[in-house]
Amino acid sequence: MTRLTLAIDAMGGDFGPCVTVPASLQALESNPHLHLLLVGDPDIITSSLATADSALRARLQIIAAESVIASDARPSQAIRASRGTSMRIALEQVKEGHAQACISAGNTGALMGLAKLLLKPLDGIDRPALMTVLPHQQHGKTVVLDLGANVDSDSAMLVQFAVMGAVVAEEVLAISRPRVALINIGQEDSKGLTSIRDAAAILRAAAEINFIGYLEGNDLLTGKTDVLVCDGFVGNVTLKTMEGVVRMFLSLLKSQGEGKKKAWWLRLLGRILQKRLAKKFGHLNPDQYNGACLLGLRGTVIKSHGAANQRAFTVAIQQAEQAVQRQIPQRIAARLEAVLPKSD
């Protein structure tokens, strides 16, 4: 395997180097071909590496950044004042060919704007979309997009999202001719916004896309489709609602059997059930699928949750590794050329 180099916005997210540096070391430990560029405050990063194994540190390079884009900064202002920030410098490593992907837990709006500015969309893509791969109840996975990059999407953008999602399902999930569906408020052809109905008509006519129609929000984790497409507003609300419910469920499992007033055999039974249920549903833990890929650019960008812990940020790095190895941007470009109508 050839050398793989990724750029990390080490200062981004709620916890900065406290999470990004240990996660980087964990990723290096699991992949001997991986090299990382840690972008941020050299003193803070060096301090976080004080006890790191020398063999792992040899595959790390620290790149200095003067400042950090605040998580609550308005994207437009953050982009204008982005020179010298850890996020912009990390993206510039990809633009200049020093890294093959960028991972950041920083300001989502600023990351999307800067990525589009620096890396440019692929031909045929109006705006990039945030995509993740979610587990479903049949122990497979579903590609879901857009998760918040575009609050309002017209029919052309939804079709572009469908094409990109199908490529990811083929290349990452190894699904031949993946099923593609649009999220709607019902499965009848007459329901939904005009943009959704128009996108459905285009997808039905595209022989290269295996379009199966509409699905509703409660089908998100059923495994009825391989690719689920929606605008960013619907996708973001849907994802965060699902994550909140899953975290509540796992928290309730963890709390079972802890009551001191229960008989010993009831506490024991509770712990046994807790372990079995946690094992059965643990794959739904949001930490295990952290990292949304910004699809539609001429480079790979992964957006981690701002509140990601070490385990979750490591998963985001691994998402970037997979996207680069599968050549997702290049394969999307080839598919777009085959599916989308040529412009005059």
Swiss-Prot record:
Pathway: Lipid metabolism; phospholipid metabolism
Annotated Pfam families: FA_synthesis (PF02504)
Enzyme class: transferase
Subcellular location: Cytoplasm
Keyword Disulfide bond part of the UniProt annotation: no
Reaction(s) catalysed by this chain's protein: a fatty acyl-[ACP] + phosphate = an acyl phosphate + holo-[ACP]
Keywords, sorted A to Z: Cytoplasm, Lipid biosynthesis, Lipid metabolism, Phospholipid biosynthesis, Phospholipid metabolism, Transferase
Any single GO BP term: phospholipid biosynthetic process
CC annotations in GO: cytoplasm
A molecular function (GO) term: phosphate:acyl-[acyl carrier protein] acyltransferase activity
Entry EC no(s): 2.3.1.274
Function as written in the Swiss-Prot or TrEMBL entry: Catalyzes the reversible formation of acyl-phosphate (acyl-PO(4)) from acyl-[acyl-carrier-protein] (acyl-ACP). This enzyme utilizes acyl-ACP as fatty acyl donor, but not acyl-CoA.
Family: Belongs to the PlsX family.
Subunit structure: Homodimer. Probably interacts with PlsY.
NCBIfam families per the UniProt record, alphabetical: plsX
Protein name: Phosphate acyltransferase
Organism: Erwinia tasmaniensis (strain DSM 17950 / CFBP 7177 / CIP 109463 / NCPPB 4357 / Et1/99)
UniProt gene name: plsX
